[in-house]
Amino acid sequence: MTYEEKELLDIIKEDTMPALGCTEPIAVCYLGAFMNDYIKEDIAKAKEIDVIVSKNIYKNGKSVTIPNTGTCGLGLAAILGLSGGNKDDGLLVLTKFNDEMISRAKELREALNIKLSYDEKTPDIYVRMLVKFDDACVEGLLQKGHTNVEYIKVDDKVLYENKLEESSNEMKEFMSKLTLKKIKELVLSTPLEELDFIEEGVEMNMHAANEGLKLKNSNLLGQSLKKMENKNIISNDAYTKTRILTAAAADMRMSGGNCMVMTSGGSGNQGINVIIPIYLIYEEFNLKKEDMIRAIYFGHAINRFVKTFSGKLSGMCGCAIAAGLGAAAGITMMMGGTDEQIEGACSNMFANLTGLICDGAKNTCALKLSTCAGEAVLSAFLALNGCTPKENVGVVSGNIEDTIKNVGLLCRSAFNRVDDVMLDIIK
């Protein structure tokens, strides 16, 4: 492998991994689990637990159901980690919890003094936790990545430290200098044996989708769309199937189901949105397996590329402007599209869905995921049939890289204010 192939692969794999539950509350749970190794007293004796998070962690942790608990809340996520989590499980930190452990965590949440707040001047991903006892205080900080614990302190003494500032800056510099054409070249030249994780993600996310159709809840979007399809209210085709199964996977995940999904860019919903549309079009048209694998890898890479400019979390829905873009690009490439058609598919997505607000992780994310997945399919086939936006109209610039920068500017300079208003609404 060349340096560039390896660098891109390492960056993608860092944010593409199995996760159980929404990754924002899971990040809080993971930090609690990491702090376990440094807490010598029974957590039930804690006098106060302070959980300080970024605006986006707060927003995404407020209303999404934590797997196997039937309830929501970053306070519960923190206690789950502190009371029984194992840091070695990473984003699967909840997989080994049984009913007794969950019941105890719920009791501790009610009994302990847990203070939750958010800090407006932090990175997108930021969790700081202080566990205070009569004669000790344990503090942990996680930031810039869902499992990136930067330090653990006991009584202000640093016992663990892992700062990634330099490597993080190098990664951002590498990604920001890429183009869609260059990313495609690297995707196509990477040895196929290095992409085993792609098939693992397909299996995982399709399983979540199929299980989502079996959930016992008549109000779920995937099941509702499936019933409408069966009644011939909506069409029975690849576009509709994509919307149904993407929604079903989101239903499973957002309602606290016990299915792992493969993330993309650190997000499970975005992993669903990259993988399922590309895989279903591959099935529908009986395409080559290798082309599907590389298309999904391309989708992950485009998702991560956009996030270099928009941020890992923002006030704009990442499934619309990043993961959906990746799906559209991947489908177009897989169908034999030219570089111009791939850019056109991405421009279609931006012209259509830029500005879709992120109002936090919750059950209704299924609606947005379903829309973004369907529009990714539509955008790809429109581009393949010669229908793309004119240049320099609205957010769409003269080339796709500048369009991505335009949307990134909107995320950083305008939608941070949208986030503030949204937090006022949902608090």
Question: Language-model segments: what does each one mean?
Answer:
Residues 1-22, 26, 40-49, 53-63:
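N-terminal alpha-helical transmembrane segments of multi-pass membrane transport
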Residues 18-34, 259-276, 318-322:
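Conserved phosphate/anionic-ligand binding catalytic regions in large, soluble enzymes, centered on
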Residues 20-23, 55-57, 144-147, 152-154, ...:
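A structural signal for small-residue-enriched, beta-sheet-centric alpha/beta enzyme cores
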Residues 25-41, 271-287, 328-336:
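Alpha-helical support elements that line or immediately flank enzyme active sites
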Residues 42-48, 89-94, 115-117, 192-199, ...:
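Flexible, glycine/charged-enriched surface loops at secondary-structure junctions
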Residues 45-89, 102-113, 291-341, 345, ...:
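A structural-propensity feature for long, helix-poor, extended segments
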Residues 109-256, 421-427:
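Signature of multi-pass transmembrane helix bundles
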Residues 232-236, 240, 253-281, 285-287:
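Membrane-embedded translocation segments of transport machinery
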